[in-house]
C-alpha cells in the first residue's frame, strides 16, 4: 500500500469535490490555535473515532507542520488498509502560504 503527495490546492479541491477528510496530526495546542478549515485532529486518542467514521475507501489527506511527518502517518494508514491516502506537500505551512481557508481560535478565515 502506498500514498500520494499532493499540493495544498489539490487537497482543498478534494475536500470540496470528493468529500475527502483532512487529518491534522500536529499537537493539540497548534491545532486549537489554527488549522485548515474542517480538519479532523488525528491523535492516538481520536484514532478510534476516525476509524469508526471513515471507511477504508474514503479519501484521506494527512497534514502536519511541514509535510514531513505526515508521510509516515499516510504510510501507516495505507498499511492499515485505507485505499485513497494522500500527504500534503508543505503541510500546514504550505496550506497557509497557499492562502487556503483556515479556522483559528478567533473564527474562520475565508479565502
From Swiss-Prot:
Give the reactions, separated by semicolons, that this protein catalyses: thiosulfate + hydrogen cyanide = thiocyanate + sulfite + 2 H(+); thiosulfate + [thioredoxin]-dithiol = [thioredoxin]-disulfide + hydrogen sulfide + sulfite + 2 H(+)
Q: Which GO terms describe its cellular component?
A: cytoplasm
Coiled-coil zones: none
Annotated source species: Actinobacillus succinogenes (strain ATCC 55618 / DSM 22257 / CCUG 43843 / 130Z)
- Under Enzyme Commission nomenclature, its number is 2.8.1.1
Q: Where does the secretion signal sit in this chain?
A: none
Write down what this protein is called.
Thiosulfate sulfurtransferase GlpE
Q: Where in the cell is it found?
A: Cytoplasm
* InterPro entries xref list: GlpE_sulfurtransferase, Rhodanese-like_dom, Rhodanese-like_dom_sf, Thiosulf_sulfurTrfase
Record domain Rhodanese: where: 16-104
Gene this protein is translated from? glpE
Catalytic residues (positions): 64
An example of a GO molecular function for this protein is: thiosulfate-cyanide sulfurtransferase activity
Amino acid at each position: 500500500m502506498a500514498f500520494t503527495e499532493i499540493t495544498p490546492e489539490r487537497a482543498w479541491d478534494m475536500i470540496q469535490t470528493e468529500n475527502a477528510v483532512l487529518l491534522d496530526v500536529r499537537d493539540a495546542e497548534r491545532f486549537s490555535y489554527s488549522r485548515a478549515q474542517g480538519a479532523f485532529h488525528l491523535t492516538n486518542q481520536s484514532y478510534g473515532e476516525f476509524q469508526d467514521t471513515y471507511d477504508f475507501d474514503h479519501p484521506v489527506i494527512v497534514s502536519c507542520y511541514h509535510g514531513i511527518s505526515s508521510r509516515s502517518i499516510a504510510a501507516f494508514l495505507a498499511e492499515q488498509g485505507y485505499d485513497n491516502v494522500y500527504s500534503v506537500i508543505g503541510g500546514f505551512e504550505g496550506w497557509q502560504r497557499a492562502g487556503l481557508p483556515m479556522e483559528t481560535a478567533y473564527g474562520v478565515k475565508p479565502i
